[in-house]
Regions:
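Proteolytic maturation boundary segments
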Residues: 1-17, 207-245, 401-423
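His/Glu-based metal-binding/catalytic segments typifying zinc-dependent metallopeptidases
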Residues: 14-41, 46, 190, 197, ...
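M16 family metallopeptidases and their MPP-like homologs
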Residues: 14-16, 22-34, 40-42, 59-113, ...
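Short, polar/flexible loop-turn hinges at active-site or ligand-entry regions and domain interfaces
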Residues: 52-55, 96-100, 117-126
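Acidic/histidine-enriched alpha-helical segments
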Residues: 63, 117-141, 227-237, 334-362
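Short, flexible, solvent-exposed loop/turn segments with mixed acidic/basic and small polar residues
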Residues: 78-81, 186-193, 305-308, 400-404
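Short, low-order "capping/linker" segments at domain edges
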Residues: 138-143, 240-252, 357-367
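Non-catalytic, conformational "gating/processing" segments within enzyme and secreted inhibitor domains
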Residues: 182-218
Length: 423
């Protein structure tokens, strides 16, 4: 696998040469600082761009063209990492060497037509297309409430700090989506093209010069950006733990505990605390939380701990019967305390092996390989070989030391089940 960067002035092309896959993947990555007021507009924009454009006037026209391009797939995704908003337009295509003709240029032209020839008239996006996307986004936002786990997590982060970027839904709210007009979306489109950093990743077995020439012919990005894009999002700590309970019609209660990670070194963020989380509850069925809550007390089916590195948060969530909520919280706190003194060499070895396996598996899929190089470029992620060697150096003493560097911020319960089970 050979990786190269090609500076094109207003954007960068990243080529990843490998013959492991029959497809070629092209991902156009737009990146900027999160703006809470614009998140809904951004998410909506990238969905609208792929509905139709001035050349392919309907969604059906788009799909028919993709079928002509050997069933190529074009899609977009918008997400948030810490304080950074990322939107990717992705083309997954069969390598032309397996096709009847070299259609690479046609496919790349199709990709950039979606970006640079949108369905805009008189500085306004097509209203019917916009309404279709808005209705879909609103439905997606509302369905979060139908997923108790996601709903509880979203609520818990808002309870922790409603103003924090960690609590922000990148799709926005129903109200903000409803406020999007054709002219406002056009303003967002101009804003993204003028101010987002652009990186184009290409992975597969291809002629490098041919790909670069084709992309440079259609990628008409012309603004050089110099501002800083910050990925780390700082959350406030709390002297007194905040507790809140809300009621729901769910069969079980959702329990969420949010901890701040405090004063971790860069190395601890990248390596030691990753292993801490794997031992605690982010790894296999051999974690401390799993043993404490499920094996020893048969409390739950769903249990997870998540380390949000770029938000300095550790989040623990579980689903239990309402009568067991207080016990579950007590046991989680006990497990956190055990991490200070009761970590074993065997637990470290299991966690490290899981991490190494995950790193190796990331190179089995083109999209995950692109993510690997993307985060090497926009964050402090080390290369895979370095990460594997550093994880092997983690000891139980190092993990027990970082266990001192967390503090409980918020306990949130989305209560379900019989309201008489627990007062």
């Amino acid at each position: 696998m050979v990786y190269k960067q090609h500076n094109m002035g207003s954007y960068t092309i990243h080529t990843i040469k490998t013959d492991r896959f029959k497809n070629i993947g092209i991902e156009v990555v737009f990146r900027n600082n999160v703006d809470p007021k614009r998140c809904a507009f951004r998410t909506c924009l990238f969905d609208v761009l792929l509905e139709n454009n001035l050349e392919y006037k309907t969604k059906r026209d788009m799909i028919l063209m993709q079928e002509e391009l050997y069933n190529s797939l074009l899609y977009s995704v918008t997400y948030k990492v810490g304080a950074t908003a990322i939107s990717s337009v992705v083309l997954d295509m069969l390598n032309p060497k397996y096709a009847d003709y070299n259609y690479l240029d046609d496919a790349i032209k199709y990709l950039f037509t979606a970006i640079f020839n949108p369905n805009i008239t008189n500085n306004e996006f097509d209203e019917q297309t916009l309404n279709t996307v808005k209705n879909r986004l609103i439905a997606d936002i509302k369905t979060v409430k139908e997923n108790p786990t996601k709903h509880a997590l979203q609520n818990a982060l808002k309870v922790m700090d409603e103003e924090s970027l960690s609590a922000l839904n990148i799709a926005g709210t129903v109200e903000t989506v409803e406020s999007i007009t054709p002219s406002k979306l056009y303003e967002e489109y101009k804003e993204v093209l003028e101010h987002d950093y652009i990186d184009i990743y290409v992975i597969g077995d291809f002629n490098e010069n041919e790909v670069i020439d084709s992309i440079s012919n259609y990628a008409k990005f012309d603004t050089i950006k110099t501002h800083e894009v910050e990925i780390n999002n700082t959350n406030k700590t709390r002297k007194k733990v905040l507790e809140q309970r809300d009621e729901s019609n769910n069969a079980q209660s959702q329990v969420v505990l949010i901890y701040n990670t405090n004063d971790l070194t860069d190395y601890e963020k990248k390596y030691t605390f990753q292993i801490y989380n794997m031992v605690l509850g982010g790894g296999s069925l051999e974690t401390k939380l799993y043993h404490k809550l499920r094996d020893e007390n048969s409390l739950c089916y769903s249990l997870r701990s998540m380390y949000q590195k770029y938000d300095d948060l550790l989040i623990i969530g579980t689903s239990v019967d309402k009568s067991n909520v207080s016990l579950a919280i007590k046991l989680i706190k006990e497990t956190i305390k055990e991490m200070l003194t009761e970590v074993t060499d065997e637990e470290i070895a299991t966690a490290v092996n899981s991490k190494i396996s995950a790193i190796n598996m990331a190179f089995d899929e083109p999209g995950r390989i692109i993510d690997e190089y993307l985060f090497r470029n926009i964050s402090d992620l080390d290369d895979a070989e370095t990460r594997i060697e550093e994880y092997k150096n983690i000891t139980k003493e190092m993990v027990m030391n970082v266990a001192k560097k967390i503090s409980l911020n918020t306990i949130y319960v989305l209560e379900g089940g019989d309201s008489n089970e627990e007062n």
